[in-house]
From Swiss-Prot:
This is Uncharacterized RING finger protein YBR062C. A zinc finger (RING-type) spans 109-153. The keyword Nucleus does not apply. SUPFAM superfamilies: RING/U-box. InterPro entries: RING-H2_zinc_finger (IPR053238), Znf_RING (IPR001841), Znf_RING/FYVE/PHD (IPR013083). GO terms for biological process: protein ubiquitination. Pfam families: zf-RING_2. Keywords: Acetylation, Metal-binding, Zinc, Zinc-finger.
Length: 180
């Protein structure tokens, strides 16, 4: 009796049968598959914390073996970017303040929902690009973790850079007016 490969004229792919550390790649794949199958079967049936920890460790080890190193490095870099995702501390302090007289009785902070006028001395700031108003304390906490407006999710740092460039160009034009 002939094999499937012989009947269909398929030649054996040499890379499937390369010996790597004494076992072929196909054997390694079978081992990984059986480990993953056992892991997923037992994953929800753990009785103690130690079992769950060992299962998750095994899962991470298997995934690290299966994923290319370049992809692992890319994911680690993306995770590191997320840690320092907030605005500089000076950004919130530099935002323009809103005068108490310009606030309406119905104006509330969109983060904490506190009425601005309940406070005797409200510290209300406005984001320059979208003109959304927030309590300074609430916005400072938000901007320490994110670079977006809490309401519209627009990037506040990108607009700040554009505004700085525009004011610099305007100042340069004014200076040239003195000499012309």
């Amino acid at each position: 009796m002939s094999t499937y490969e012989e009947e269909h004229g398929i030649q054996q792919n040499s890379r499937d049968y390369q010996e790597v550390g004494g076992t072929s790649q196909e054997e390694q794949r079978r081992q990984v598959r059986s480990q993953l199958q056992g892991l997923f079967q037992n994953f929800g049936n753990t009785s103690g914390e130690g079992d769950a920890h060992s299962d998750s460790t095994l899962l991470l080890r298997l995934l690290s073996q299966m994923l290319p190193e370049s992809l692992q490095e890319e994911w680690l870099q993306e995770m590191d970017k997320g840690k320092s995702a907030g605005c500089p501390d000076t950004f919130a302090a530099s935002l323009p303040r809103i005068n108490k007289k310009k606030l309406k009785a119905t104006d509330n902070c969109s983060i904490c929902y506190t009425n601005y006028l309940e406070d005797e001395y409200p510290l209300v700031v406005e984001l320059p690009h979208c003109h959304h108003k927030f309590d300074l304390e609430c916005l400072s906490v938000w901007l320490s973790r994110s670079t977006t407006c809490p309401l519209c999710r627009d990037n506040v740092m990108g607009h700040r850079i554009i505004n700085e460039i525009d004011t610099t160009e305007a100042e340069l034009e004014e200076d040239w007016g003195m000499y012309g």
